[in-house]
């Protein structure tokens, strides 16, 4: 922590920092910072009235070693002291290939003129759910829609991904709900139930059923526009969830229907699901509970045999499959699992779309993907690889003020997002937060239209699975084969 001499010793940084980094030394009459406590959230830097603070990389590092890195050494020391599992938050920061950045989008030139989105209509709406294999007409020749499966209608192919009430604050949830309603998209409750105040946003809400069944009851199931069964999460495939008792207080515990102060532990498996047949029973139980009026989503992590898994899920009766990739975010996960388990969403998506098409069941389900969707360009590339829509979470949190300090698990978020401390929660204004989310998604929608028009395409549906619109660069032949795209120049 670097402090400029123009510091006025107003002590605002001391007041704003929940990690107790700053304090006033009355003896020397100066402000002092404890660098070991700093999580790099930039709260103090942002609020300093004279811009006297700057966070810089420390020079107090171990000798350079590509194998035994500074982080590795610190983690070994920490485990030697505690004997515990290392916990981390957000998505994996490891230097793994980011395939979005190795894919380039096509553009029309000369023979296939581009479309100007400012002057021509561009369709960004998408419908998620099972589609008919053929158009059916009634006796009068009109299209018969009476037997169509329930659909989610989105104004653009983006939704706010699952983040539970408890993992994030009341004000963060309210911001997401308000923005989803204004945008004509959906937000996901996560596995912590739905706060009583947010039932009013039910038409733009996806309610989630996870292995812990927290906050699940008949009214909850019928409150949303869709139900998502969480089988896995990209940041921690194969394990359950854990909300510490320090966050399970007040409305959080009441919403989850658990004793206040108790840890909310979701088991690794659903104890009633050990096969596709078991999953089918739950899917149809949920359909019965909602009188077949809402689509059922099954969410899984992107793992090694994901194509075969999605093939089974498509046959379970699910209407939508959500796939969460290796870089997906989380409020807390074991570090070793977050950084070493699962596969990138780009490869998983391409493999699943191909498998479902080959088996002739692609129209039976919609595919929604998440796991580090960072921009409108990532959305376009995902659609071209076969997705119907994308989940975003980390980008949405950044719009709310998250500075990616990766300390969600400690519950002292200085921006009022990943905390239940009332003094910190009130730092996030839901009205301002929802407007920032609306601004972000509006900007993405404009960019999506621009890129579609540049390709000479006027609808999302025309782009879905159209891998001719993509070219790879710097990828191996095997990677190109799995992605189903040609190399740049071909």
Task: Identify the function of each model-found stretch.
Residues 9, 14-15, 19, 24-30, ...:
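Glycine-rich phosphate/ribose-binding loops and adjacent secondary-structure elements
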Residues 43, 175-182, 278-285, 312, ...:
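Alpha-helical scaffold segments in soluble metabolic enzymes
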Residues 1, 21, 30, 36, ...:
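Conserved, well-structured core domains of diverse proteins
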Residues 57, 63-110, 330-346, 354-366, ...:
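Conserved active-site-proximal phosphate/metal-binding subdomains
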Residues 227-276, 281, 288:
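Active-site cores of enzymes that catalyze phosphoryl transfer or operate on phosphate-rich substrates
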Residues 156-161, 183-185, 203-205, 225-229, ...:
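Structural beta-strand/beta-sheet cores of well-ordered domains, especially the beta-sheet scaffolds
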Residues 5, 9, 36, 40, ...:
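Catalytic cores of large soluble enzymes that bind and process phosphate-bearing ligands
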């Amino acid at each position: 922590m670097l402090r400029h001499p123009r510091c006025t010793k107003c002590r605002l940084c001391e007041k704003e920092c929940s990690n107790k980094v700053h304090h006033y030394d009355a003896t020397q009459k100066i402000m002092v910072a404890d660098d070991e406590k700093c999580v790099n959230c930039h709260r103090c830097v942002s609020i300093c009235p004279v811009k006297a603070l700057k966070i810089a990389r420390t020079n107090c590092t171990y000798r350079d070693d590509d194998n035994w890195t500074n982080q590795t050494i610190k983690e070994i020391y920490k485990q030697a002291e505690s004997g515990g599992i290392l916990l981390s938050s957000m998505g994996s920061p490891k230097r793994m290939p980011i395939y979005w950045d190795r894919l380039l989008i096509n553009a029309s030139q000369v023979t296939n003129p581009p479309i100007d989105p400012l002057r021509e209509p561009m369709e960004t709406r998408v419908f998620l759910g099972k589609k008919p294999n053929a158009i059916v007409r009634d006796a009068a020749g009109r299209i018969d829609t009476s037997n169509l499966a329930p659909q989610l209608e989105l104004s653009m192919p983006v939704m706010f991904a699952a983040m539970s009430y408890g993992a994030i604050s009341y004000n963060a949830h309210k911001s997401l709900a308000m923005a989803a309603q204004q945008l004509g998209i959906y937000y996901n409750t996560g596995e912590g139930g739905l706060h009583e105040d947010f039932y009013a946003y039910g038409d733009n809400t996806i309610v989630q059923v996870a292995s812990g069944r927290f906050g699940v009851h008949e009214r909850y199931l019928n409150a949303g526009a869709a139900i998502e069964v969480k089988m896995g999460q990209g940041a921690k495939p194969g394990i359950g969830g854990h909300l510490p008792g320090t966050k399970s207080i007040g409305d959080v515990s009441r919403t989850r229907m658990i004793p206040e102060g108790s840890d909310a532990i979701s088991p690794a498996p659903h104890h009633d699901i050990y096969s596709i047949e078991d999953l089918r029973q739950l899917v149809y139980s949920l359909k019965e509970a909602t009188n077949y009026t809402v689509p059922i989503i099954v969410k899984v992590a992107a793992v090694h045999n994901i194509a075969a898994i999605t093939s089974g899920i498509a046959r379970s009766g699910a209407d939508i499959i959500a796939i969460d990739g290796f870089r997906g975010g989380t409020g807390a996960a074991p570090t070793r699992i977050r950084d070493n388990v699962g596969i990138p969403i780009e490869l998983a998506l391409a493999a699943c779309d191909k498998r479902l098409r080959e088996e002739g069941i692609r129209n039976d389900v919609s595919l929604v993907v998440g796991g580090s969707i960072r921009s409108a360009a990532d959305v376009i590339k995902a659609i071209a690889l076969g997705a119907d829509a994308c989940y975003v979470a980390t980008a949405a949190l950044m719009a709310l003020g998250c500075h990616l300090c990766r300390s969600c698990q400690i519950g002292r978020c200085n921006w009022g997002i990943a905390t239940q401390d009332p003094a910190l929660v009130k730092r996030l204004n839901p009205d301002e937060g929802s407007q920032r989310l609306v601004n972000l998604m509006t900007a993405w929608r404009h960019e999506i239209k621009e890129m579609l028009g540049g390709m000479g395409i006027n609808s999302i549906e025309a782009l879905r699975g159209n891998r001719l619109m993509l070219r790879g660069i710097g990828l191996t032949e095997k990677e190109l084969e799995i992605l189903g795209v040609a190399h740049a120049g071909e």
